[in-house]
Amino acid sequence: MNINIKNLVHAFSKLPSLGPSSSRRLVIHLLQNKEKVMLPLASSIKELADLIIECKVCGNLDTQSPCSICTNPKRDTKLMCVVEELGDLWAFEKGSIYSGMYHVLGGRLSAINGIGPEKLNLDNIPKRVTEFKIEEVIIAINPTLEGQVTVQYIIESLKNLDVKVSRLACGIPMGGEIDYLDEGTLKAALTSRQEYESNIK
């Protein structure tokens, strides 16, 4: 196999859900459809790579900072949903089921993987609550063991602030991923969200 083609296959294989076989099929499709698929795709990727930046307010990825969500006057600025990754934010947005603000952590705490609070967008949460006078923080963290540790860290960081802290209602299985949920399930979990009993007064 040509080294350039081999490198492209290897690059695709690093993407989520793509193994060597799937990557080879994708590359073959691109090579066989150079004008219609390969060149437009390469152009779009290059353009986005040059423009994409992280929102200095919420951690979203956009072509502007603050991002298009943070600057949208129709969003409810008193409501903030904390999510792990960009994919979780997109899951809420695709169904138009949420109209508040977001806070993207960029992952979850993991002692095994060496991910501490300093590597995540955690310390800005209480700062945003205070600065923007947020009234409710919705914690939409994936229900894993590491996710639970992350949730406890967030709750502890907000304990001295006058803010309601809630979580998505039951329905998301342990170990489940928010960005894989269908819109109906996610909407129900959000609508029926519950305030943490040990709230931070």
Swiss-Prot record:
InterPro entries: DNA_Rcmb_RecR, Rcmb_RecR, Rcmb_RecR_Znf, TOPRIM_dom, TOPRIM_RecR. A zinc finger (C4-type) spans 55-70. GO terms for molecular function: DNA binding; zinc ion binding. SUPFAM superfamilies: Recombination protein RecR (SSF111304). GO terms for biological process: DNA recombination; DNA repair. It holds the Pfam family RecR_C. Residues 78-173 form the Toprim domain. The keyword Zinc applies. PANTHER family: RECOMBINATION PROTEIN RECR. May play a role in DNA repair. It seems to be involved in an RecBC-independent recombinational process of DNA repair. It may act with RecF and RecO. This is Recombination protein RecR. The lineage of its organism: Bacteria, Pseudomonadati, Pseudomonadota, Alphaproteobacteria, Rickettsiales. The gene is recR.
